[in-house]
Design a protein with these regions (language model features):
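Short, flexible catalytic-loop segment of classical short-chain dehydrogenase/reductase
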Residues: 49-59
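Catalytic tyrosine of NAD(P)H-dependent dehydrogenase/reductases that use a Tyr as the general acid/base
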Residues: 19, 27
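Active-site helix of classical SDR
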Residues: 22
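C-terminal helical subdomain
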Residues: 46, 61-98
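Residue(s) in the substrate-gating loop at a strand-loop-helix junction
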Residues: 6
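Conserved catalytic-site region of short-chain dehydrogenase/reductase
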Residues: 9-11
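Active-site loop immediately N-terminal to the catalytic Tyr-X3-Lys motif
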Residues: 13-17
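Alpha-helical segment proximal to the catalytic Tyr-Lys
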Residues: 35-39
Length: 118
C-alpha cells in the first residue's frame, strides 16, 4: 500500500499549517496501519514528495528541490521493490527537512517567514 504524504508532514509553516497537519495525520495513520499489518504480507510505504511540478502547481512559486511526477514515480517503484517504509522525493529533500525539523521554533519561523516573504 503506497500512501502519498508530503515533506510538509515534517513541520508546518505559517502559510501551510492546515495542509501540513493533514499530511502529518496521514503519516501517523500510515505508521499505525503498518504496525497493525506487520506480518500480514502487506507493506505500507509512505512517500513524502516535495514540491511537484503539475497542472495544479502551475503559476505557484517554485520551491527549492522541486520534482516532477515522473521522478516521484521512480522513487515509488524503487520503494516498492526494496520494501522501504518511508521515502522522500527527491531524496535530497530528506536532510533539508531533517534540519528544518530540528531548528528552534523562533529560528524556523524567521527562516520560513523570510523565505515566503510573509
Amino acid at each position: 500500500l503506497v500512501v502519498l504524504s508530503s515533506v510538509a508532514a515534517e513541520r508546518s509553516r505559517f502559510d501551510n499549517y492546515v495542509y501540513a497537519s493533514t499530511k502529518a495525520g496521514v503519516d501517523s495513520w500510515a505508521s499505525g496501519l503498518a504496525d497493525a499489518l506487520k506480518g500480514s504480507g502487506i507493506d505500507v510505504i509512505v512517500v513524502r514528495p516535495g514540491f511537484v511540478h503539475t497542472k495544479m502547481t502551475t503559476g505557484l512559486p517554485v520551491a527549492p528541490l522541486a520534482t516532477t511526477p515522473d521522478q516521484v514515480a521512480v522513487v515509488i517503484v524503487e520503494a516498492i521493490k526494496t520494501r522501504k517504509p518511508l521515502v522522500w522525493a527527491p531524496k535530497t529533500v530528506r536532510p533539508l527537512m531533517s534540519t528544518l525539523r530540528h531548528l528552534p521554533r523562533p529560528v524556523f519561523q524567521a527562516v520560513t517567514k523570510k523565505a515566503g516573504n510573509g
